[in-house]
A protein has these predicted regions:
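Residue(s) in the substrate-gating loop at a strand-loop-helix junction
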Residues: 13
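Short C-terminal tail/terminal secondary-structure segment
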Residues: 18, 94, 106, 117-131
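Active-site "substrate specificity/gating" loop of NAD(P)-dependent dehydrogenases
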Residues: 19-23, 28, 45-46, 64
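Active-site helix of classical SDR
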Residues: 29, 37
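Short, small/polar-rich loop/turn modules that mediate ligand/substrate recognition or access, typified
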Residues: 45, 50, 116-118
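Conserved SDR Rossmann-fold cofactor-binding beta-strand/turn motif
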Residues: 50-56, 60, 109, 122-124
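Short, flexible catalytic-loop segment of classical short-chain dehydrogenase/reductase
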Residues: 56-66, 70
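A conserved structural motif in NAD(P)-dependent oxidoreductases
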Residues: 78, 90-101
């Protein structure tokens, strides 16, 4: 295996495993992606296709900044305070980066991950262990 040709990595979210009343639609679609990836891994595993899901937690992205802005507007607060407060809720004390998520995807597409299939891996700074 030289590249991520036979492997498939689906990007879901920790919201797919940990329900949040404010994210019902988002969480439901991400949960469906987790289930689909597990089913596809079973179906195509005998063909040598490895399928996994990556579940990012709080990752500092433009999408999260938009969400933080909406939360701040709804509560009469500041977007910066929402971001700071949520980052503090992560056991490692900060948001993750898109590069950290990409590093996991790169690993899953490498020979080192040739026996990993049908699983969901969280990239969330330990937050899932505290939910």
């Amino acid at each position: 295996r030289t590249k991520c040709i036979r492997d498939r990595v689906m990007i879901s979210s920790s919201a797919g495993k940990y329900p949040n009343a404010a994210l019902i639609d988002y969480g439901a679609t991400k949960a469906a992606m987790i289930s689909i990836s597990k089913s596809l891994a079973k179906k195509y595993g005998s063909d040598g296709v490895l399928i996994n899901s990556v579940l990012p937690g709080l990752i500092h992205t433009a999408m999260w900044e938009r969400a933080a802005t909406e939360i701040a507007e709804a509560s009469g607060g500041k977007m910066e305070d929402v971001i700071k407060g949520n980052g503090a809720s992560v056991p490692v004390g900060r948001y993750g980066t898109s590069d950290e998520v990409a590093s996991l995807i790169t690993f899953l597409c490498s020979e080192a991950a040739s026996y990993i299939s049908g699983t969901s891996i969280e990239v969330d700074g330990g937050q899932s262990g505290h939910i």
